[in-house]
Amino acid sequence: MSTIYFLPKAGAVAQSAIKMELPDTAKTWQFNKKIASPQELQALSADTQFSKAICLSARPDEYAANGNLIPDRIDLSIVLSGSDLNNSIHRPERCMPAQGHTILSSSNQKLRISSGRQFEVKRLVSVQSQQVAGVKKREEYVNYHCVTYYFFVGHDQITNDHLGRTLIDMKDRIIRG
């Protein structure tokens, strides 16, 4: 006796509403675009897309000892999931320790956008330790105090919850492709 299973053909993944192209500037912010690290490319599936930038905005009237303006910094990452749910996108708590972060706290925060709408984001407070470049006699590290906000965008829903993101993603892929 045999059994035949009829499975639908896998269709193309629906296009995302997320704009992956980052601007060069936004108000006082300068976007210095960067590529995904080899570790990110190795850890995530090949069809995962990245848009990344280090964004700097000089603080008015705040100068370093060398006379340069002191900037505020935002590390911006947009990661667009590929077809493999398990190896294409994940919550930052999974990869931040490999990037030198020690996560000190995690909480939910409301983010209000210019339209007046709001949604919940995850807020992580961490310390990132990075080796100082150019130091030859001994290893020297500098610590950065970081705040990370993240959320996941589905077809028509936003969530800051990993399980919620997985369920939204599965529903969107079944219904919308």
Show where each model-derived region lies:
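Hydrophobic membrane-insertion alpha-helices, especially the h-region
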Residues: 1-4
